[in-house]
Amino acid sequence: MIRRIFTSSFITVLLSFAAYSAYAQEKPLLGYNKLKTYVSYFNAIDTETVKNYVTNDHAYNWMAKNIPLFECPDSAIQKIYYYRWWTFRKHLKQTPDGFIFTEFITPVKFTGVYNSSSSALGHQIYEGRWLHDPQYINDYIKFWLYVDPKQKKPHLHTFSSWIDDAVYNYYLVNNDKKFIEQVIPALNTDYRQWEAEKQLPSKLFWQFDVRDAMEESISGSRIVKNKRPTINSYMYGNAVALSKMASLLGIDSVKNKYSKKAIELKKLVQDSLWNDSASFFQVRRPDGSFADAREELGFIPWYFKLPDDKPAYAKQWDQLTDEKGFNAPWGITTAERRHPLFRTHGTGHGCEWDGAVWPFATTQTLKGLAVLLTNYQNKGSMTPAVFYNELHKYALSHIKRGVPYLGEYQDEKTGYWLKGDNPRSSYYNHSGFCDLVINDLVGLKPRADNMLEVFPLIPQNQWKWFALDNVLYHGQRISILWDKTGSKYHKGKGFIIYIDGKPIMRCAKLKHVLLKMPV
């Protein structure tokens, strides 16, 4: 088994825990009052027309047992953090084949057994990896790998997926090697199935936009086999993840096979899907021409750290903050606003991806931006302030008629939810938010080794305090506090990290740190 872990060079804070002994934290540092207040409010404004495994009456108790606690001065981000966990548990469904998470709160005719849908599977695993009880996500992953394939009409391949990448990143949180050992044969089989179904002789993958869950797009088609940054980035991320999982298990033949596939696909994406004249990753048609639109899907390669660390690629991100590009009052548009076909495919009759704001894509783009800011030297014009402002805008967008709401997609100028009051759209489980707060804003970076890494993307002087508490990571409780003056939490000034209730790091500045955890 290969156990060597490579880390990038950066300034670290390295502490030894040779004398550290396990300490059971009796209660979270933050307490549960804020959680209880939010749940009471969300319950009060809800009609609860659909009840699944965790009803509103049990929402507080379930959340108290399962979610990390969070507090910050940004009331929008804080409120929506708890709202998103509250809505997420609405979709937890107990079936004869174990737990699953639904996408639509009401039954939809084009879904699979138990109203299952795979389009946002990657988002759901990333979000759910922070739940304390692993049974929910374990069951959900096994549902797609073992239950869905036995159906008369399997649905996993109805949509492109980054399931392997999500499973590996789930492992990085809970360190459950046995689970990886159980599922890697099925993941390996699934990858081969994608190759058989969607891989071209060039070794790139093709996909219809509707099968990327991005229909009615400017560049896409329901009949033309376009080479898209979406599925090719996903398959790259899946290959990298399979290589790492195989390495973890000491299966060198599988590790080497997928490492080779990842290297090959990375080169193909950069050589074939990068349009130098547009400075953007774009869809390429079968005739070799590029679609003439910059679309938000062009940011997806960074989600998986695919692009090389070069200024030419980083330049693409300038479009994110350009009002003629993707910057709109209510969020990040799915196509550049300057394009003549922007928002021309109608509104609300289907699922139009020709410019409206989709939380699904916003999640991908913000994750990609976080990867750029924390893993690349060449960041272009991007800064933590850009990430923070976009996340704040994303939080503010969760509103309808003055109360918290999560739907399918929005008008970029007014914030109107384009499916209106369609019942299927309420609490739409098709994106992520809590993971963006934990993993990217606060910056808890799960790792395969015995290190605790925190890389905050909170701009300097943005907040005087915040706390992320009760995070279950590698079987231990993690708390991350920032208290500039020491007057908020009364535990001292500065940046403080706790493991199982004991402070193990203090420093004056909010910065990137790397700590050795107890064995």
Regions found by a protein language model. Name each.
Residues 59, 63-75, 122-133, 163-179, ...:
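Well-ordered alpha-helical scaffold segments within catalytic/enzyme domains
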Residues 27-51, 58-61, 150-161, 195-261, ...:
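The feature captures the catalytic groove of carbohydrate-active enzymes
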Residues 1-26:
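Bacterial Sec-dependent N-terminal signal peptides
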Residues 76-113, 130-153, 196-227, 267-359, ...:
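Extended glycan-interaction surfaces of carbohydrate-active proteins
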Residues 245, 249-283, 314-476:
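Non-catalytic carbohydrate-binding regions of carbohydrate-active enzymes
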Residues 23-112, 172, 177-179, 188-193, ...:
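Acidic/polar, glycine-enriched structural segments that form the non-catalytic walls/loops
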Residues 462-496, 500:
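Carbohydrate-binding surface patches
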Residues 26-31, 76-79, 83-90, 101, ...:
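Substrate-binding cleft of carbohydrate-active enzyme catalytic domains
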